[in-house]
Swiss-Prot record:
Sequence ranges of Basic and acidic residues compositional bias: 65-83, 164-182, 539-549
Stretches the record annotates as Disordered: 23-229, 536-573
Ranges of Basic residues composition bias in the record: 114-123, 550-559
InterPro entries the UniProt entry points to: RRP8, RRP8_N, SAM-dependent_MTases_sf
Assigned protein family: Belongs to the methyltransferase superfamily. RRP8 family.
Coarse class of the protein's main subcellular location: nucleus
Primary role: S-adenosyl-L-methionine-dependent methyltransferase that specifically methylates the N(1) position of a conserved adenine in helix 25.1 in 25S rRNA. Required both for ribosomal 40S and 60S subunits biogenesis. Required for efficient pre-rRNA cleavage at site A2.
EC number: 2.1.1.-
Annotated localization: Nucleus, Nucleolus
One Pfam assignment: Methyltransf_8
Protein name: 25S rRNA (adenine-N(1))-methyltransferase
Ranges annotated as biased composition (Acidic residues): 144-163
Enzyme class: transferase
Amino acid sequence: MFPVKGLSVSADKLKVEPGAIVGTAPAAPAPASAPAVSSSKPSKKRKRHGGDKDVNVDASNLVDLWEKVIEQKKEGVADGVKKHENKRLKKEHEGQGEKLSNSNNDGNQGERKNNKKKNKNKNKNQGEHGIQVAQKKGPKKVEGEEDEDDNNDDADEWEGIDEDEKHASSEKPTPKKDDKKQQQLQQQQQQKKQQKNQEKDNRNGTTSNWQQDKPQPKTATPAPKLTPLQASMREKLISARFRHLNETLYTRPSTEAFKLFEESPEMFTEYHEGFRRQVDVWPENPVDVYIKEIKERAKVRFAPKISGGAEGGKSLPPARFPLPRDQKTKVCTIADLGCGDAKLAKTLVPLKQKLRLEIHSFDLQTGGCELVTRADIANLPLPDNSVDLAIFCLALMGTNWLDFVEEAYRILRWRGELWVAEIKSRFAGSQARVKQPPQKKVVAHSVGKRKKGSALAVAEEEEGDPEQNNLDLAVHVDGDTSKLKKPHETDITAFVEALKRRGFLLNRDFGDNSVDMGNKMFVRMHFVKAAVPTRGKCVPKDGQEDTTKNKKGGQKPKPKFIEEKDEQEEVKDEAAVLKPCVYKIR
């Protein structure tokens, strides 16, 4: 016989049930207080795991009882019992879309509404009870459970909640309302912390990190709301302001311009804003050309074997030659004189370790850039012979631009390079160097000019200019057209001679490439510190004494028919080699 917990009956009192199956043990009799239960039909009540003492255990129901009590599986509904509920459950689970009759639906809708409220608390209790049973694996029976089973007689009836829905509802940890409350509390706590941090920062006079990370607005941003007419007028005002400042800088010495920008630094930003607008119209910016050339030449280690232009050899581009460097440190020191917004330094400073460069930028005002040093170009804060490359990129401004050249000679090492880029319209040509006397021209209506075949005219035509004749012969015989001047070619001979007197020569290694006139707006020239100056502040003192003495130690006689003021007049004319940019008053 299958043992049942809580029962101890002696073997003498056991009796064989009538109609029992042969080979099976008789079931234990139920107590007197309990109602009689027939062996053929089990109880219809769904009882808890503690109320199994009233059920007879047979071979037929042994598996069902094991699954129900031990494995905690729910008992299936018997055939013929609760047909209406069984059909509904089958239709919902098997996916059959059949609808029940209206009479059955009307009768069950009221039960669903009433049972939904009751089952909320029951589902919670059942879910908690099911978890405890799974953990303990069959808890012991507690007294007083029979009364609870009697009160739950209607538990087997379908209450409008599916089994899957019961499990899903029991697995939910907390309702949504609690989550919203927790989120609101967390947000309030974070706001309180931020307010406390702000109060501390205000007391200490500091700003928090999120305030420091905010981008600061630009100073020179245009107005956000401008009509097309206002925008065009603003462009005209900016260009007019630039022309006024540009003319001021070209017609004054550098000392006055230095004081002007010292008193009003905002004029420096206004000037360069207009300058950028002007450069945008140009086909090419000389600063970009210099940046590219520095990058290319910094990678070259050795000069090519064939030198260009020195002995009539083939001229090579500057990119084939290395940059001038200090022999000890192997570092090329660059001085950008009149740097403006320091575009060259901003581009090359991140590459200075790779290319072994050191860059100094100077201008009349820093413009808020840390890479720029405020200084007058005529008086640079650099020692003598400390720079390998000096650059004047559209920076020879002011009436004392020759002082800039002399200062560049002072700071450059021997064989150091000087790069100059200047507007073509500024070069006055060779006529600005020497004042020539007015030539006597024959009047068009003179009698002598009207004579046909005069001997003087024929002689002049036959002789002609000897230099021009030689050039014509070179063109016809040798085909050499390099020395012929084009009608619109810029004449830079006076400028080259002025720099030659101050110790700078065109780079013979580059040959014809030492002067680049390919751009229609400006000229680029490559000079080298390779001569002793005869003019300016860099003239050696010993050389001045030697030039005034002859071989015997006495004074050299002054040449006749030369006035003493010729040298001063020639110096004045040298300053006029570069014309200032003066605009027409409209």
